[in-house]
Amino acid sequence: MKPSTEDPPAIACPIGPVVDIVFSRWTTPILWSLHAFGRQRFVELQRRIGTVTPKVLTQRLRRLERDGLIVRTYHPEVPPRVEYEISDLGQSLAPLFASLGEWAAVNLPEVDKARAAYDVRGA
């Protein structure tokens, strides 16, 4: 069945909500880092990800916790310690990330060639 222009976006693209959750700005690097390196404190995540501001990282971590993709653990010590780790639900994305990594390794050179050809044409 061909989607009509009156169909809601979720029907027109059923993976749209997943793309919004998993591939929004900074979310993918956070999930990738927690998957690859395990439980981490805020500063460790910030260091690994790079240019993300503390405010934005905090917002993304809260959103991912709300979505059930990460777990935040508060340790009532002096000084207080907070750690983040990927949840079972977040871990279920591992095959998707592996597939995307494989696709990138194989196809990004072709994307670079296409971009260069496009730029040469001056389009």
What is each stretch, according to the model?
Residues 76-99:
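Basic, amphipathic "hinge/linker" alpha-helix immediately C-terminal to the N-terminal HTH DNA-binding motif
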Residues 65-75:
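A short, conserved structural fragment
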Residues 32, 67, 96-111:
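Alpha-helical linker/hinge and terminal dimerization helices associated
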Residues 24, 28, 36, 91, ...:
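Generic detection of well-ordered alpha-helical segments
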Residues 9-56, 67, 83:
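N-terminal helix-turn-helix DNA-binding core of bacterial DNA-binding proteins
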Residues 1-9, 33, 68-69, 96:
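Short, contiguous, well-ordered secondary-structure segments
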Residues 60:
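Residues within the DNA-recognition helix of helix-turn-helix
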Residues 1-9, 19, 106-123:
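HhH-family (HhH-GPD) DNA N-glycosylase catalytic core used in base-excision repair
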